[in-house]
From Swiss-Prot:
Site feature (Plays an important role in substrate specificity) residues: 219
Catalytic reactions of this protein: (6R)-5,10-methylene-5,6,7,8-tetrahydrofolate + glycine + H2O = (6S)-5,6,7,8-tetrahydrofolate + L-serine
Disulfide bonds: none
Described purpose of this protein according to its UniProt entry: Catalyzes the reversible interconversion of serine and glycine with tetrahydrofolate (THF) serving as the one-carbon carrier. This reaction serves as the major source of one-carbon groups required for the biosynthesis of purines, thymidylate, methionine, and other important biomolecules. Also exhibits THF-independent aldolase activity toward beta-hydroxyamino acids, producing glycine and aldehydes, via a retro-aldol mechanism.
Protein known as: Serine hydroxymethyltransferase
GO BP term, pick one: tetrahydrofolate interconversion
Subunit structure: Homodimer.
Organism listed in the record: Mycoplasma pneumoniae (strain ATCC 29342 / M129 / Subtype 1)
Encoding gene, per UniProt annotation: glyA
Known EC number: 2.1.2.1
């Protein structure tokens, strides 16, 4: 291997081994997924869909893509699936291309309240090519206000309503969203990038019976390779959705990643995966409860999912202090945050990655105490050094990718 990139790979491997990862959108894939993602399939160009390609020599990748499609449908109970999107953003873009015209109104959750860039943010394609409107959350409960969603939808008459979030910790009522969309004549898109694993495990309501289309990533709670997917039970729009991906916004799909997605879906069908997701939820709820007992403002007063947010006043400083102690998470805005996104008030904490690594409830509570110690020290260098030492000692008991070296 080229020496410079070998050094970087081993350096990153060591960083992952030596850090407690609490980034809600990250996880550790299996060795099988690592291997398939780096496989010979990366060599094959395969524009089009199985049995309908624009290149010859696709008979083998037709098999792997068909496996991925069918296993995805089995996992989520979908009538149709497209596994070609390179990311969640690509999946959303393809849906917009398929169902909307430039300038059409879209309605999504405000970014500061937990929405995503691709749900209508003015700096994103979704806010530039379409007319974006937003709903917020109840400022008291910090939960979705379905009455407000209905009020705004009646007012702006969107062509598409998006229910899906990057930082919302409560169960989503897809049935209520469906009723709102039907009343105003809008398509309903559920972006389940964060909660896909919970849905797959049956530990969060499935949006497919209530929505026109569902998008997701494969690399968060699903614990797969980096990528996206689209699903639908609305047979009237599936040809449009296929065209939205190819030729709409992508050319050749990444066949090595698609094969790894199949492995991911297959792993998520195993009984032990449901127990994993249950542990993820339990660990997040326990951590959130502990912080609440210590007097922290936990957004929405808790969590039903794999993540939660804390208002710590200075999220950027806190996230940087924690990184110095080998605890990695991300700064995040809190609802109605008066601070800018580059220096927000909050931090976001997720439990999928370290649950994969073997952490139990007691380990997460120990880490919560370490986080609390650093915050209360106001980033004291001596305290950070002590916490880093404790982190490294704890991680000795949880080896990551044992025997792997580049």
């Amino acid at each position: 291997m080229e020496p410079k990139i070998r050094r970087i790979l081993n350096k990153e491997l060591q960083r992952q081994r030596d850090c407690i990862c609490l980034i809600a959108s990250e996880n550790y894939v299996s060795r099988d997924i690592l291997e398939v993602t780096g496989s010979i399939l990366t060599n094959k160009y395969a524009e089009g869909y199985p049995t309908r390609r624009f290149y010859e020599g696709c008979e083998v990748v037709d098999e792997s893509e068909s496996l991925a499609i069918n296993t995805c449908k089995e996992l989520f109970g979908a009538k149709w699936a497209n596994v070609q999107p390179h990311s969640g953003s690509s999946a959303n873009y393809a849906v917009y291309l398929a169902l909307l015209k430039p300038g059409d109104a879209i309605l999504g959750l405000d970014l500061n309240c937990g929405g995503h860039l691709t749900h209508g943010n003015k700096f994103n394609f979704s806010g530039k090519q379409y007319q974006p409107y937003s709903y917020t959350i109840n400022p008291e409960t910090e939960m979705l206000d379905y009455d407000e969603v209905l009020r705004v939808a009646r007012e702006v008459k969107p062509k598409l309503i998006i229910c899906g979030f990057s930082n919302y910790s409560r169960t989503v009522d897809f049935e209520r969203f469906s009723a709102i969309a039907k009343e105003v004549g809008a398509y309903l898109l559920a972006d389940i990038a964060h909660i896909a694993g919970l849905v797959a495990a049956g530990l969060h309501p499935n949006p497919l019976p209530y929505t026109d289309v569902v998008t997701s990533t494969t690399h968060k709670t699903l614990r797969g390779p980096r990528g996206g997917l689209i699903m639908s039970n609305n047979e009237a729009i599936i040809r449009k959705l296929d065209s939205g991906v190819f030729p709409g916004c992508q050319g050749g799909p990444l066949q090595h990643v698609i094969a790894a997605k199949y492995v991911c879906f297959k792993e998520a069908l195993q009984p032990k995966y449901k127990q994993y997701i249950q542990n993820v939820k339990t660990n997040a709820a326990s951590m959130a409860s502990w912080f609440k007992q210590q007097g922290y403002r936990v957004i929405s007063n808790g969590t039903d999912t794999h993540l939660f947010s804390l208002d710590v006043g200075k999220g950027k400083d806190v996230s940087q202090w924690l990184q110095q102690a080998n605890i990695v998470l991300n700064m995040n805005t809190v609802p109605f945050d008066k601070n800018p996104a580059i220096n927000p008030s909050g931090i976001r904490i997720g439990t999928p990655a370290m649950t994969t690594r073997g952490f139990k409830e007691k380990h997460f509570l120990y880490v919560a105490a370490l986080i609390d110690k650093i915050i209360k020290s106001d980033g004291n260098k001596k305290v950070i050094k002590e916490v880093k030492k404790a982190v490294l000692k704890l991680l000795e008991r949880f080896p990551l990718y044992k025997g792997l070296e580049y």
